[in-house]
């Protein structure tokens, strides 16, 4: 009975529930490159679903790994220059005259399902437990309870608290505000942060 009330089991339950759906898979912290802000295997899988990808490689790059490295480098350069991850996910970017798409948003409903964007169904959501998000500074070696990735890119973080251990969503929010540096690159890049307990989910931020 105690194990069911343990915070780690609470986290494990959520991760396994998500990974059990058709929308998600479960990845490990070692799959994610903190410096490059990407799970490159998941990003590559999504890129391969785009008809332009093989043409781009053939015409402009030595091989697929070379092309992938440039895509990841471009993403990081744009983020470093102030472009938001949301903008990159929505708009993608041009590379060697071809549009690189990093995500596909839900198309408008039509009477003909064939009109829907086929790439939308190829989006890959991943859940990662206990993922380190910094290798230096204030946040060095800190871990996120859960992180959600879209096509390998980090979009959501969650800090979990189990009420059975005497902590609530308030403690989770406090942890974000006192133990997460607001200028951390990973945290600034993510779209949203949540504090969560057994009964409540609240938006929060790494600054007081």
Language model features: what each stretch is:
Residues 1-205:
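An alpha-helical interface "stripe"
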């Amino acid at each position: 009975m105690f194990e069911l009330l343990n915070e780690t089991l609470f986290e494990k339950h959520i991760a396994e529930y998500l990974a059990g759906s058709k929308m998600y898979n479960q990845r490990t912290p070692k799959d994610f490159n903190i410096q490059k802000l990407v799970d490159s295997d998941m990003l590559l899988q999504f890129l391969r679903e785009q008809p332009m990808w093989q043409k781009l490689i053939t015409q402009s790059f030595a091989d697929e790994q070379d092309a992938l490295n440039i895509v990841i480098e471009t993403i990081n350069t744009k983020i470093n220059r102030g472009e938001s991850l949301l903008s990159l996910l929505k708009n993608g970017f041009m590379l060697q005259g071809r549009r690189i798409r990093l995500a596909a948003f839900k198309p408008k409903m039509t009477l003909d399902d064939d009109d829907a964007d086929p790439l939308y169904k190829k989006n890959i959501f991943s859940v990662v437990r206990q993922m380190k998000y910094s290798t230096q500074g204030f946040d060095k070696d800190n871990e996120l309870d859960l992180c959600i990735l879209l096509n390998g890119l980090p979009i959501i973080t969650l800090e979990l608290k189990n009420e059975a251990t005497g902590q609530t969503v308030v403690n989770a929010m406090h942890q974000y505000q006192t133990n997460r540096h607001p200028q951390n690159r990973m945290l600034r890049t993510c779209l949203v942060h949540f504090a969560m307990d057994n009964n409540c989910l609240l938006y929060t931020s790494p600054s007081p």
